[in-house]
Regions:
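A contiguous, surface-exposed recognition patch within enzymatic or periplasmic domains that forms
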Residues: 2-47, 158-213, 220-223
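HotDog/MaoC-like acyl-thioester-processing domains
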Residues: 1-14, 83-170, 244-247, 251-283
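Catalytic-pocket segment enriched in acidic/His residues
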Residues: 191-192, 196-277
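A broadly conserved detector of short glycine/acidic/proline-rich loop/turn motifs that flank catalytic sites
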Residues: 24, 31-32, 174-176, 185, ...
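Residue-level preference for alpha-helix termini and adjacent loops
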Residues: 19, 43-46, 54-63, 82-83, ...
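Hydrophobic, proline/glycine-rich low-complexity stretches
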Residues: 1-101
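N-proximal short alpha-helices
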Residues: 1, 63, 69, 75, ...
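Phosphate-binding glycine-rich loops and adjacent basic patches that engage nucleotide phosphates
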Residues: 21, 63-70, 140-145, 174-185
Length: 283
């Protein structure tokens, strides 16, 4: 059958060795729009290698490269065009350094049956080459039209309540060239740069990478709630609810709930939700 959870989960995976330096981090940050306040020391720390802080979402770059081969591994027989990135979850074990040599272990964690779609959960465990754990990234990927194979439907979603006045509401503009810059960090999907490809996919023009939106919103939360301290992020998860066109403005809202913040990001120009069911977990 196209999706076989037992085969997929049992299939051996290969660790990926990777490394980064300050230049790679700087490019990622600029791809998220960092540097817009050129006289603010807290903002400059994202774009000046002399005192560089690293957003934890940078870890999706090596994490994605590690899990990419597992997307079409044994037990996962489908057309890649059916794949839709549904959710992203990050757990930070230690702050990311500006330079590092790392190893990421990919894992097929689960394959759930969602009726009309399959849900593939891939996990990337990233550690330094001396064994220090840095982060865990989970990629939840919907495979459209590949459900109904009789598997486990997975855990129920957690309760979600964003009533009341938010602790933070901030507007985050995206640049018309945002996707063109972000793709330089490695995601060269033509959906984000080729107008013809985007039109065939049903969009008016190329859309922004979901993981770019994910990183931009995380930065807004770090700046607005954590005093710009990237090391204060313990976890960050979000559901990709809608697309963003480069040049649009995100309105990010966060509600304090016990030890975490519930977060939502909307597109101001179209009144649609881009990120939902998002949770920031400070250390």
């Amino acid at each position: 059958m196209p999706l076989d959870p037992d085969v997929a989960i049992a299939a051996p995976q290969t660790d990926l060795a990777d490394s980064w330096d300050a230049n790679r981090v700087l490019l990622y940050h600029v791809g998220l729009g960092a540097g817009t306040r050129p006289t603010d020391p807290a903002e400059l720390a994202y774009v000046n290698e002399r005192y560089l802080k690293v957003l934890p979402t940078f870890s999706v770059i090596p994490g994605f490269e590690a899990v990419r081969p597992a997307m079409l591994g044994p037990g996962l027989d489908y057309k890649i065009s059916k794949l839709l990135h549904g959710e992203q979850d990050l757990v930070v074990h230690n702050p990311l350094p500006p330079e590092a040599s790392v190893i990421t272990t990919p894992v097929v964690e689960a394959v759930y049956d969602k009726g009309k779609a399959g849900l593939l959960v891939l996990r990337g465990e990233t550690r330094t080459d001396d064994g220090t754990p840095l982060c865990t990234n989970r990629f939840r990927l919907f495979i459209r039209g590949e459900g109904g194979f009789g598997g486990d439907s997975g855990p129920a979603p957690e309760p979600w309540d964003v009533s009341g006045e938010p602790a933070l509401r901030v507007s985050v503009p995206t640049l018309p060239q945002q996707a063109a810059i972000y793709r330089l960090s490695g995601d060269r999907n033509p959906l984000h740069i080729d107008p013809g490809f985007a039109a065939r996919a049903g969009f008016d023009r190329p859309i922004l990478h979901g993981l770019c939106t994910y990183g931009m919103v995380c930065k807004a939360l770090v700046d607005g709630l954590l005093d710009g301290d990237t090391a204060a992020v313990g976890g960050w998860s979000a559901r990709f609810a809608g697309h963003v066109y480069p040049g649009e403005t995100l309105v990010v809202s966060a509600w304090k709930r016990h030890d975490r913040f519930l977060v939502q990001a909307e597109v101001a120009e179209r009144g649609v939700v881009a990120l939902s069911n998002a949770v920031l977990r400070p250390r």
